[in-house]
């Protein structure tokens, strides 16, 4: 008997009456007007509209706008730009009607940096009631020159200027340089969807969100600090899984700021309209003090955070102590480490996460002596391309590991689900592979470039890019239920089985590398049954159409369009096959569910993106039960009867297919 299943978004809730977060009305008409505003961003060859006047009564607002120069790149990591970005976003977010929102957007657009405008407009649009669910162009559609190398942009420009109509440029030819081991990872580091996801996550959960905005919008960002920890923790784990798949050691931690950064990086990115060229970082440079920030400040902030972690309490701005040992502790710590405006004491705990991005991005010209532009680490849209991003976030991750390791390990009683036994787990691919073998391959997709960019002045163009893809597969979970019918939450993780030296991981080391693949609910009848779930229904990912489709045709079924690319759900593996453990843990729906309205959820990717306007619909800590130190050396010692695992081999076929 196959049990009924439903995704967590559908089940971990108790919704009564009308939707709390209904989608906006007149979506098509509103989307058209919003696209008309955005069509001018980064497009000098679109006819400009008349500069609207500042309305009476708004003069004080505009005293704080126009500070960041037009030719610069906006950085959410650079705190000096936060006030202006927040002012712009709040001014648009608090417009009393949709028409007023559009009017305010046009006024703001003419007066601030375009890069900053796109971010502020996106934050406002995502969080306004009357624009909820309306799809906007993603960052790679507005700024394709932040995602496509400059040589590709030049080829596009030359093709159009020579008279070609709708040319197709092939950007799939990337070569591995044996002198640069990280060149094996271009398919991951420079993936359009991965970097677009990272940018959009920071739109959904902006660091500049604060209590005053919650009061204005009546929207509480539930567990935002914990989401910052977990999403970036998962990015680091996924990066290390790709490194192991390519025969590379796991990334090192960037933690001693006096040591040379061994890994250089050349972005090969230029904003064509302005000539802004992302800085190249040679091997073995050492970060230096900035005029506005010293490394000693960074060390002081780090030490204060670690002191709070080890004491189990943090110092609030009003002088009171805030416990880090209760269920809110990880969220409080997440806001402190991200250095968001929801940090309980920003003057004391500082801005260690964001300013490390800034200090690393200016490593070759820290004081601006040579007039160089900043590196990829400076920009949220480009930072995840740089291997240093993962080394830095591994340091950030270690702050959270210190915290988690200080918590009491889960006992067998904590972990056991009395009536439920998982008897067997299998993973079955759809491509004819043997059981518990899944194949990956390369897939070609098309990035569409609209007319009006400096490189598409005379027409549209298309660019063929290549990304990882995998065959579809099913989880097959054999369950025995010793009681009556149960609603069960199934948590699915994947972790590499062997390290770079081909030694099997100790369980505590492995659980820290676990990648969440899915989290879903099934109604399990009494007795024996089999629960099946398809990989395409993952609670972690969003569909490929959100990256390579048109904003006009994308589904508006969820408010966020947030999540990891579906095609990167599993690591690449290799031709011989890389072994991973898939773990499945069953927990009680009755204990886990949180009263939450489905209409408010980020429908594509609950695990990474949460609920935009409501409670996170899962009571357990993110990453449970692998989030804490275990008093066990192996999974067999750790597991209870409601857990099981299987070894899965991921093989890369080397095939290239068209999407």
From Swiss-Prot:
SUPFAM superfamilies in the cross-refs: Di-copper centre-containing domain (SSF48056), E set domains (SSF81296), Hemocyanin, N-terminal domain (SSF48050)
Cysteines paired by S-S bonds: 562-609
Glycan-linked positions: 318
Pfam families: Hemocyanin_C, Hemocyanin_M, Hemocyanin_N
GO CC annotation, single: extracellular region
Positions of Cu cation A binding: 198, 202, 232
Signal peptide: 1-18
Transmembrane region(s): none
GO MF annotation list: metal ion binding; oxidoreductase activity; oxygen carrier activity
Keywords: Copper, Disulfide bond, Glycoprotein, Metal-binding, Oxygen transport, Secreted, Signal, Transport
UniProt note on tissues of expression: Hemolymph.
Record-listed Cu cation B binding positions: 353, 357, 393
Localisation: Secreted, Extracellular space
Family classification: Belongs to the tyrosinase family. Hemocyanin subfamily.
Subunit structure: 36-chain polymer consisting of 6 hexamers, each of which includes 4 different chains, A, B, C and D.
Biological role stated in the UniProt entry: Hemocyanins are copper-containing oxygen carriers occurring freely dissolved in the hemolymph of many mollusks and arthropods.
Name of the protein in question: Hemocyanin subunit B
Species of provenance: Scutigera coleoptrata
Gene: HCB
